């Protein structure tokens, strides 16, 4: 749960983080975090918050850099009939990061769809390689924070991550076959569609709507 490492952008914080990493590497010890809420596994009785559901697990895996987003997603998705299999809040991942959890969830037979909330990635090449592999076998839906200048500054102070440019990120995610969303509501709706509706083949899709402005909001 601790913070106060490199995300503070101070010499003391960076030195403390380096000391922690050195000790972990010497002991061959894997750490989730720091600055996170850890694991949620309803069937194993492990949760991040006392209000989270415990019991039968579902088909969704969720990976989040933000603890509050991880908790909020698990509770709202449960209210809407989407049950979590496993969820992890990993903070700024000084040992295990988004690529590690995505690779693990991709191999988990109990997880049929994966949702992610990311603020930045440390090793872009490895992340894209893992994402391409996992997305070829099961759907991956990604909500990325920090898509504005102010959001990027907030992320740097929150998890110490650097958000890449929007165009670069969008292009890379599209090439890997993942689905992008822009809110937790859209994330849940997309996962519901993927889990409960038959797959759409080809391009025979029509969109009907009321107000013209809302239909023209995005390309």
Report residues per predicted region.
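Catalytic-core regions of core metabolic enzymes
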Residues: 1-219
